[in-house]
């Protein structure tokens, strides 16, 4: 048997971290077992679905590297198939037409609640054989009245539902459009899904869907219901906790592999290991090892993990992702120093690629103004002489590499009887516009001789102007 898993989001909003974790678990399970991973877009809610959301899902999957083997398949292209199955269920007496009006259903619900009963459809149309004039019917599934449904869940173990507690769910609305519980069964059946990994908010749908499978003469797939992700307040993760689109994490400067690593550890672990390559995830992950209890999303832990990935990844890999962020700032990284070298100079301290992009910008374009506090502190008349001397030494430099530049700075400091910081910091502000940069000799090598001289000239002119103002 070839393992077949799927990710089936609804394009009614952004792709959030809970959905990504579900997709990741399904993808890892398929990859671990040499199976197939299918992407299905459940877009039957035409009012709320949008192509913008579809594109956001596809973009997110691509950025994360969760490549799918088949799809994307769209449910709106399969309405004729759903109608065919509805007719089959009606013909086999596993479904029936229900003519109850909304008012009648509301009255039924109110009476049941008054009797402190669980609200549910009472089946009054199960054996109705004549249409009701002026009423468009829905199609309901004729749920078994006896027996039980046993779900052998890979995460939760054996879960048992009594059929007499399940009501007759709607399969098709009055306008003929199919409902979720029908479409998901037909799709999983037609697409040969062997394993369905999804959030545990779907657990109560599982016995209903299983009964539809049985009515169609098919065995349901193996299910695994993973617990939800909670915010720090132990409430379900939402926008107020930062549960934004996965692409917002890209915009904030997170690496895709850092986000995947963080999400795989929400509910799953392998000893005390914190950091996993994608290859290690595929090798070690097992859906049966996922915890049953909910996990808490910790933004600080994600940030720490992102920092570790930035620090320890190949500079060329970081540069590939950093180039996108520089592009967002209107910077073409091909017009300047080697981007991998710029990355290497900053990897040790950068927490996000967004931070690194802003810190890298002065290497590729002139900064608009000096950081005011730093300029007032470091660019003053007392450094005019040392800076002019340093500029002349730089102008005559025969080798523009960090060790040689370091020696030039030391020689200048000694000749003016200064401590290194008294010249290095003004130089840093002059070159970068701010008091923070990689080591000053490395910064100068990356900046290049011509740009370094031009920026020292700019700083000298700025100091002169302030001194004479």
From Swiss-Prot:
Regions crossing the membrane: none
Which locations, inside or outside the cell, does it occupy?
A: Cytoplasm
State how the cofactor is bound.
Answer: Binds 1 zinc ion per subunit.
The Swiss-Prot or TrEMBL record lists the needed cofactor(s) as: Zn(2+)
Keyword line: Aminoacyl-tRNA synthetase, ATP-binding, Cytoplasm, Ligase, Metal-binding, Nucleotide-binding, Protein biosynthesis, Zinc
Would you name any one GO CC term? cytosol
Q: What GO terms describe the biological role, i.e. biological process, of this protein? A: glutamyl-tRNA aminoacylation
Identify the residue span(s) of motif 'KMSKS' region.
236-240
**Catalytic activities:** tRNA(Glu) + L-glutamate + ATP = L-glutamyl-tRNA(Glu) + AMP + diphosphate
Which CDD domains does its entry note?
GluRS_core
Q: Which GO terms describe its molecular function?
A: ATP binding; glutamate-tRNA ligase activity; tRNA binding; zinc ion binding
Q: Give the EC number(s) listed in the UniProt record.
A: 6.1.1.17
| Major subcellular site | cytoplasm
Q: Which InterPro entries match?
A: aa-tRNA-synth_I_cd-bd, aa-tRNA-synth_I_codon-bd_sub2, aa-tRNA-synth_I_CS, aa_tRNA-synth_I_cd-bd_sf, Glu-tRNA-ligase_bac/mito, Glu/Gln-tRNA-synth, Glu/Gln-tRNA-synth_Ib_cat-dom, GluQ/Sye
Question: Ligase: is it a keyword of this entry?
Answer: yes
Question: What's a Pfam family in this record?
Answer: Anticodon_2
What is the recorded function of this protein according to its Swiss-Prot or TrEMBL entry? Answer: Catalyzes the attachment of glutamate to tRNA(Glu) in a two-step reaction: glutamate is first activated by ATP to form Glu-AMP and then transferred to the acceptor end of tRNA(Glu).
NCBIfam families from the entry?
gltX_bact
Indicate the family of this protein.
Answer: Belongs to the class-I aminoacyl-tRNA synthetase family. Glutamate--tRNA ligase type 1 subfamily.
Protein name, as recorded = Glutamate--tRNA ligase 1
**Source organism:** Nitrosococcus oceani (strain ATCC 19707 / BCRC 17464 / JCM 30415 / NCIMB 11848 / C-107)
Q: Which gene encodes it?
A: gltX1
């Amino acid at each position: 048997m070839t393992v077949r898993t799927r990710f089936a989001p609804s394009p009614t909003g952004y792709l959030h971290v809970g959905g990504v974790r579900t997709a990741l678990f399904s993808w890892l399970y398929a990859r671990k077992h040499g199976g197939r991973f299918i992407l299905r877009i459940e877009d039957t809610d035409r009012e709320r679905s949008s192509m913008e959301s579809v594109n956001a899902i596809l973009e997110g999957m691509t950025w994360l590297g969760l490549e799918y083997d088949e799809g994307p398949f769209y449910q709106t292209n399969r309405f004729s198939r759903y109608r065919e199955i509805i007719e089959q269920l009606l013909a086999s007496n596993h479904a029936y037409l229900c003519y109850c009006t909304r008012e009648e259903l509301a009255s039924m619900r109110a009476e049941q609640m008054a009797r402190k009963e669980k609200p549910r459809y009472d089946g009054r149309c199960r054996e109705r054989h004549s249409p009701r004039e002026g009423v468009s019917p829905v199609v309901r599934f004729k749920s078994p009245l006896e027996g039980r449904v046993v779900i052998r869940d890979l995460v939760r173990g054996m879960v048992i539902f009594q059929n007499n507690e399940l009501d007759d769910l709607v399969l098709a609305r009055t306008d003929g459009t199919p409902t979720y519980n029908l479409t998901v069964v037909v799709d999983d059946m037609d697409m040969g899904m062997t394993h369905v990994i999804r959030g545990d908010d779907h657990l109560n749908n599982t016995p209903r869907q299983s009964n539809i499978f049985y009515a169609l003469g098919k065995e349901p797939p193996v299910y695994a219901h993973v617990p939800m992700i909670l915010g720090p307040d132990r409430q379900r993760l939402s926008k107020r906790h930062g549960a934004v689109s996965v692409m917002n994490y890209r915009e904030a400067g997170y690496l895709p592999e850092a986000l995947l690593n963080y999400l795989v550890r929400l509910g799953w672990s392998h000893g005390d290991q914190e950091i996993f390559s994608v290859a290690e995830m595929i090798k070690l992950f097992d859906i049966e090892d996922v915890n049953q209890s909910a996990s808490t999303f910790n933004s600080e832990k994600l940030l720490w993990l992102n920092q570790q990935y930035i620090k320890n990844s190949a500079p060329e890999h970081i540069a590939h992702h950093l180039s996108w962020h520089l592009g967002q700032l209107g910077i073409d990284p091909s017009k300047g120093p080697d981007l991998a070298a710029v990355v290497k100079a900053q990897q040790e301290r950068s927490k996000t690629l967004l931070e690194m992009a802003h810190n890298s910008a002065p290497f590729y374009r002139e900064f608009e103004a000096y950081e005011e506090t730093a300029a007032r502190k470091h660019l003053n008349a007392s450094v005019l002489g040392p800076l002019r001397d340093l500029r002349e030494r730089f102008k005559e430099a025969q080798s523009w590499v960090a060790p040689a530049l370091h020696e030039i700075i030391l020689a200048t400091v000694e000749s003016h009887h200064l401590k290194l910081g008294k010249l290095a910091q003004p130089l840093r502000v002059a070159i970068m516009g701010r008091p923070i940069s990689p080591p000053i000799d490395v910064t100068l090598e990356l900046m290049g001789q011509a740009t370094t001289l031009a920026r020292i000239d700019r700083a000298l002119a700025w100091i002169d102007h302030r001194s004479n103002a």
